[in-house]
UniProtKB/Swiss-Prot annotation:
One of its GO terms (cellular component) is glutamyl-tRNA(Gln) amidotransferase complex. It is an enzyme of class 6 (ligase). GO terms for molecular function: ATP binding; glutaminyl-tRNA synthase (glutamine-hydrolyzing) activity. Allows the formation of correctly charged Gln-tRNA(Gln) through the transamidation of misacylated Glu-tRNA(Gln) in organisms which lack glutaminyl-tRNA synthetase. The reaction takes place in the presence of glutamine and ATP through an activated gamma-phospho-Glu-tRNA(Gln). It comes from the Bacteria. HAMAP family: GatA. This is Glutamyl-tRNA(Gln) amidotransferase subunit A. Its EC number is 6.3.5.7. It comes from Campylobacter concisus (strain 13826).
Length: 452
């Protein structure tokens, strides 16, 4: 597949041919489930003829049906463009197809999608990751030049790692959330999934920057990073030793080999442990579900989306939500409502926010003395469908990504090897807030070393 950097140099005729080639591939690979709607049903022609970018199904594109992979939003057509879409259109990039996801971005496998699951292009028996599994699968399978996803607790980095792509989660507030279907407003962040580090940086540049329409967008000066990538710059990298040691044997072997290559290239590598990580999962799921409970209260069958049959207003609310939401979404709404209820708010939510502050301080302390943090993206490579049928087991698999969202830091997943089933292993690099340049420099160095 042509890279994003190459495609941006194409003539209008070459871009037209690329779009036709992608459309033919998408139809041929329909069983992969990377996309959720036939391209013919989308108003692609009205959105410009730029380089095609796949869009996760929770990002508003004017004239498109946007459902967050949920039955409750059946029939909803976006009346406006998200800010990231407007930015794409101004940079000779254009939306090209809706990618599958876990319902309302709640999951790590795409199995909770109303449209059905997406398959991992590397091995169809294994999950592609989530919640941006469709975006990652599309890029990995050559069905997209690059894609946009959203990351609340690893939803860009984990599927990118499982499918063998590069996934970048920007600093919280760096990319506008205006037009994103909200899951957890203090954690959500839109970012790119791409074939390589340079393409990820190019797409990041296209969507980043302050947006007055988004109250969570930070008014921090933005400077392009893709034209200043330096993979030869020597960096101080701190490895989270206990995270690497606790990964599966094949994941650990690939990560340790990557660490040795970083050392041999002249990077300064030190080791430390995260001592209090036992609170990460609990803090994340308390905060995320509490915010989800509030955000998803707007879906009631009255204003937009699917409306259930009912005899009165109460039945309309109950039936629309009961029939429209999937089991995982219902579970998280219930949990979030519980932790916000009288008598439990102080016991759970306030404590979770204190744990969040502690997690952020722990990251900041390490990054005071280092340029980057190195750790796994996931404890193992992509697991088989149904392997994590227990919700708690599934939540625990997010252990290496969720704390980065709690801290609001930028992070990237970079492929570093394969296991004996040809499944991808990725390393995760984390940088100081607003320092995506150092993050990309380190990722490019690692990518170069792995590719040789």
């Amino acid at each position: 597949m042509v890279t994003l950097k190459e495609a941006l140099k194409f003539s209008a005729e070459e871009i037209k041919n690329l779009r036709a080639e992608l459309e033919a591939k998408i139809i041929k690979e329909k069983e992969l489930g990377a996309y959720v709607e036939q391209l013919a049903n989308l108003e692609i022609a009205k959105l410009g003829e730029g380089v095609p970018i796949a869009i996760k199904d929770n990002i508003q594109v004017k004239g498109w049906s946007v459902t967050s992979a949920s039955k409750i939003l059946q029939g909803y057509v976006a009346p406006y463009n998200a800010t990231v879409i407007e930015k794409l259109l101004s940079k000779n990039l254009a939306p090209f197809g809706r990618t599958n996801m876990d319902e309302f971005a709640m999951g790590s496998t795409t199995e909770s999608s109303f449209y059905g699951k997406t398959l991992n292009p590397l091995n169809h028996a294994h999950v592609p990751g989530g919640s941006s599994g469709g975006s990652a699968a599309a890029v990995a399978a050559g069905l997209a030049v690059a894609a946009l996803g959203s990351d609340t607790g690893g939803s860009i980095r984990q599927p990118a790692a499982f499918c063998g792509c590069v996934g970048l989660k920007p600093t919280y507030g760096r990319v506008s959330r205006y037009g994103l279907g909200a899951y957890s407003s203090s954690l959500d962040q839109i970012g790119p999934i791409a074939q390589n580090v340079e393409d990820a940086a190019i797409l990041y540049d296209a969507i980043a920057g302050h947006d007055p329409k988004d109250s969570t967008s930070a008014d921090v000066p933005f400077v392009s990073i893709s034209d200043k990538i330096d993979g030869n710059k020597k960096l101080k990298i701190c490895v989270i030793k206990n995270y690497v040691e606790n990964a599966s044997e094949q994941t650990k072997a690939a990560l340790n080999l990557a660490i040795e290559k970083l050392k041999s290239h002249g990077h300064s590598v030190t080791y430390t442990n995260f001592e209090d990580s036992k609170y990460d999962v609990a803090a994340y799921y308390i905060i995320a579900t509490a915010e989800a409970s509030a955000n998803l209260s707007r879906y009631d069958g009255v204003r937009y989306g699917r409306r259930a049959e009912a005899r009165n207003l109460k039945e309309l609310y109950v039936n629309s939500r009961s029939e429209g939401f999937g089991e995982e979404v219902k579970r998280r709404i219930l949990l979030g409502t519980f932790v916000l209820s009288s008598g439990y708010y102080d016991a759970y939510y306030i404590k979770a926010q204190k744990a969040r502050a502690h997690i952020k301080a722990q990251y900041e302390k390490i990054l005071e003395e280092n340029d980057l943090i190195f750790m796994p993206v996931a404890p193992s490579t992509a697991y088989k469908f149904g392997a994590h049928s227990d919700p708690l087991q599934a939540y625990l698999s997010d252990i290496y990504t969720i704390s980065v969202n709690l801290a609001g830091l930028p992070a990237i997943s970079v492929p570093v090897g394969k296991d004996d089933q040809n499944l991808n292993v990725s390393a995760q690099l984390i940088a100081k807030a607003w320092d995506e340049q150092t993050l990309i420099n380190g990722a490019k160095s690692l990518e170069n070393l792995i590719k040789g």
